[in-house]
UniProtKB/Swiss-Prot annotation:
NCBIfam families: PS_II_CP47. One of its GO terms (molecular function) is electron transporter, transferring electrons within the cyclic electron transport pathway of photosynthesis activity. This is Photosystem II CP47 reaction center protein. Its main location: plastid. Gene3D superfamilies: Photosystem II CP47 reaction center protein. It is a multi-pass membrane protein. It comes from Nandina domestica (Heavenly bamboo).
Length: 508
């Protein structure tokens, strides 16, 4: 059978046993990849600094997903939140990876068994003796089972009733930990940033799935609906399954890119909108303002800013700064963050505090402009010295650091002031180690960016797949050239004009 590559799946079209076999093999591949990828990531992951070198800076992709479901400890004796553990238990990172690999092996064997023993009695219609599947019944079974799993996840795993809970954090990603979550049954449950909505929605959706599954098991579809939606055709199953998958992919691409309770910034990195809106900058200034109101000095107020919060307020952690095809982790780009140098405060010779305009997300270069509290430009680094009026030298700008490693250090020589003004464009200033990984200094995206790009791309592809297979199953008779009027159209002498039903001859 000389099939072209895009038609090879027709070999399982009317073969339920081997259709099942290839799906089990696919599950084996997916599970095997997940387990192997987890082991690879654990081999290269450095857990020593959860603040300045978290999993998302290191380009971890599957570790964040395990962590958000409640896995925090490793058989290597470390915890994702820092510190050591003595008894991580079976459900550690390695335990989950191993379970996936064992499951993959079992699926592999099951796939081979079903490929060899494809002609089972269960796949044959007892009335006709031909291979056939009761698709509406199978739909009911799957809906019931997935509803049961969905309900169980929401009612037991997330709530901590029988399970660890999920990763929950504060709005600024500072205090995250795995904890049990109570379902949010009020209107707050519809807020995508409220973790309680995850529990309540899984319980509600699971209940609906169980009831819908029982309905489809006990009620047969009407004949007209069965025929109209081609419920006896396996390609209908393919089309509607693709629809479910692409819809889910679009949804998770959105929750990942825009942020939600399911995609904590401690695990996947901040979103681009948090940089665009100055989200962390506002919180830092609020905390400093609160400290000053309590009669703390500027240095004391800035010293109390958590390094973790300052690190979020750095453009290198913005997932939209990495080029789409720049491979590698964020650490391979601007380097491994070593420490916060402190917050630079610039002043002109008249004592006015100046603020460096920050680089917008989609700029690679941006002019260095310093404005006062009213937004009036007071200093810059000019492109042409001959025409400059606001140069650092002319205005006499100085810089002093508060908090961090350079706390209390000030500079007045123009070259150093300009250096730190350029770096202040990129948010808070950090010392970055580019030697260890031979980092090239070009920003990379975080797993948040990769996940979004991948899922949005595949969702679009699967959308077209749904249209394609839906059209094929709905119009199969047309595409195959099978038409109820076909006999009459080609019968010699049926029409005065060949194939024209308006000129049908009268039977004498």
């Amino acid at each position: 059978m000389g099939l072209p590559w895009y038609r090879v799946h027709t070999v399982v079209l009317n073969d339920p046993g081997r259709l099942l076999a290839v799906h089990i093999m696919h599950t084996a591949l997916v599970s095997g990849w997940a387990g192997s990828m987890a082991l690879y990531e654990l081999a290269v992951f450095d857990p020593s600094d959860p603040v300045l070198d978290p999993m998302w800076r290191q380009g971890m992709f599957v570790i964040p997903f395990m962590t958000r479901l409640g896995i925090t400890n490793s058989w290597g004796g470390w915890s994702i939140t820092g510190g050591t553990v003595t008894n991580p238990g079976i459900w550690s990172y390695e335990g989950v990876a191993g379970a996936h690999i064992v499951f993959s092996g079992l699926c592999f064997l099951a796939a081979i068994w079903h490929w060899v023993y494809w002609d089972l009695e269960i796949f044959r219609d007892e009335r006709t003796g031909k291979p056939s599947l009761d698709l509406p019944k199978i739909f009911g079974i799957h809906l019931f089972l997935s509803g049961l799993a969905c309900f169980g996840f929401g009612a037991f795993h997330v709530t901590g009733l029988y399970g660890p809970g999920i990763w929950v954090s504060d709005p600024y990603g500072l205090t995250g930990k795995v904890q049990s979550v109570s379902p949010a049954w009020g209107v707050e449950g519809f807020d995508p940033f409220v973790p309680g909505g995850i529990a309540s929605h899984h319980i509600a959706a699971g209940t609906l799935g169980i009831l819908a599954g029982l309905f489809h098991l006990s009620v047969r579809p009407p004949q007209r609906l069965y025929k109209g939606l081609r419920m006896g055709n396996i390609e209908t199953v393919l089309s509607s399954s693709i629809a479910a998958v692409f819809f889910a992919a679009f949804v998770v691409a959105g929750t990942m890119w825009y942020g939600s309770a399911t995609t904590p910034i401690e695990l996947f990195g901040p979103t681009r909108y948090q940089w665009d809106q100055g989200y962390f900058q506002q919180e830092i200034y609020r905390r400093v303002g609160a400290g000053l109101a309590e009669n703390q000095s500027l240095a004391e107020a800035w010293s109390k800013i958590p390094e973790k919060l300052a690190f979020y307020d750095y453009i290198g952690n913005n997932p939209a700064k990495g080029g789409l095809f720049r491979a590698g982790s964020m650490d391979n780009g601007d380097g491994i963050a070593v420490g916060w140098l402190g917050h630079p405060i610039f002043r002109d010779k008249e004592g006015r505090e100046l603020f460096v305009r920050r680089m917008p997300t989609f700029f690679e270069t941006f002019p260095v402009v310093l404005v006062d509290g009213d937004g009036i430009v007071r200093a810059d680094v000019p492109f042409r010295r001959a025409e400059s009026k606001y140069s650092v030298e002319q205005v006499g700008v100085t810089v002093e650091f508060y908090g961090g490693e350079l706390n209390g250090v000030s500079y007045s020589d123009p070259a150093t002031v300009k250096k730190y003004a350029r770096r202040a464009q990129l948010g808070e200033i950090f010392e970055l180690d580019r030697a260890t990984l031979k980092s090239d200094g070009v920003f990379r995206s975080s797993p948040r960016g990769w996940f979004t790009f991948g899922h949005a791309s595949f969702a679009l592809l699967f959308f077209f797949g749904h249209i394609w297979h839906g059209a094929r199953t709905l119009f199969r008779d047309v595409f195959a050239g099978i038409d109820p009027d076909l006999d009459a159209q080609v019968e010699f002498g049926a029409f005065q004009k060949l194939g024209d039903p308006t000129t049908k001859r009268q039977v004498v």
